[in-house]
């Protein structure tokens, strides 16, 4: 089991939470991005640089992740693809995607894209709050505990 991060847009504070968790539980953590990333020295943490381009990092994560891995992403289509492979998906705000909710979330995303394409100003997401960070850490710990129980 491993944790994969769609790292180009992942907030630094979330990366820091992931770095500490990977060290604490000694689990492989890979940050995938199309730019160089700073990571702490660790035998559990690595970065993977991919060429720039549309969905290149996403496609690499889908290719490399395995069932029961965890993928950290705010990219809803990527979350849908890794769920189909049997991996778990968690966004940086602490929302865990599930097979039962991902279709509805994809539909809402597509609807918002249509609105934006027609000129409607929809605004972006709120800045990451302390509550979001706490929710992310709690959901990450919950997943790590599930993994520990399955492998015990």
UniProtKB/Swiss-Prot annotation:
InterPro entries linked to this entry: UPF0178
Pfam families: DUF188
Top-level taxon in the UniProt lineage: Bacteria
Family of this protein: Belongs to the UPF0178 family.
Protein name: UPF0178 protein Ent638_0858
